[in-house]
């Protein structure tokens, strides 16, 4: 399909992604992680899958936000949306027969709106860092240990990843949690980052 699209539209960039894949397919498009479930364990798994897919060359990747199968709760959807803010493939997708999970069906619409606004505010960063990785045969999403190789603790952290050169993603991935502990390597500076117009005040 990728070769056919390039032949039909040689002067245009194409957007192509698939569930099935093989090594080398990243030259033609991206991949999503398949039919996941609306489970907290799958939310955490999707965080681990992003660097793994990047290592195989798949920079354009992502999971079905909220999970594809089973019934998504509002809390799980909010956490998935938060995790996915920096992930290139950003889509809510669910199976027929599961609870409808379009964002407008939940009660905290204002919270979802703010998350989506933040996503849109970050698109220039995502695009810039994504293209840097693509042009340099690098990774857009990577484990802490790839950047902080001299830090033994960085090798133990599996629920925080780097998105581009300047942002670390450390989402809440457990049910009934209002926060989490975050490991900051010594060279890293933490800044407040809560809304699309609020990312300069140091804490």
Task: Please describe what each predicted stretch is.
Residues 1-203:
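Catalytic-domain carbohydrate-binding cleft regions of carbohydrate-active enzymes
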């Amino acid at each position: 399909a990728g070769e056919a699209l390039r032949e039909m539209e040689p002067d245009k960039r194409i957007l192509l992604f698939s569930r099935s894949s093989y090594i080398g397919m990243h030259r033609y498009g991206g991949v999503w992680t398949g039919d996941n479930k609306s489970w907290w364990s799958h939310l955490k798994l999707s965080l681990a899958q992003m660097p793994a897919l990047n290592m195989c060359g798949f920079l354009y990747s992502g999971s079905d936000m909220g999970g594809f199968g089973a019934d998504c709760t509002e809390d799980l959807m909010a956490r998935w949306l938060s995790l996915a803010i920096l992930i290139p493939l950003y889509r809510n997708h669910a199976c027929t027969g599961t609870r409808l999970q379009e964002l407008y069906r939940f009660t905290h619409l204002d919270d979802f709106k703010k998350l989506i606004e933040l996503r849109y505010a970050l698109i220039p960063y995502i695009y810039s860092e994504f293209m840097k990785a693509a042009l340099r045969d690098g990774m857009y999403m990577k484990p802490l240990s790839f950047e902080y190789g001299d830090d033994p603790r960085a090798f133990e952290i599996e629920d925080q990843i780097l998105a581009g050169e300047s942002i670390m993603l450390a989402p809440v991935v457990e049910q009934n949690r209002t926060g989490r502990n975050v490991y900051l390597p010594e060279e890293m500076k933490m800044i407040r980052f809560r809304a699309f117009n609020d990312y300069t005040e140091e804490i």
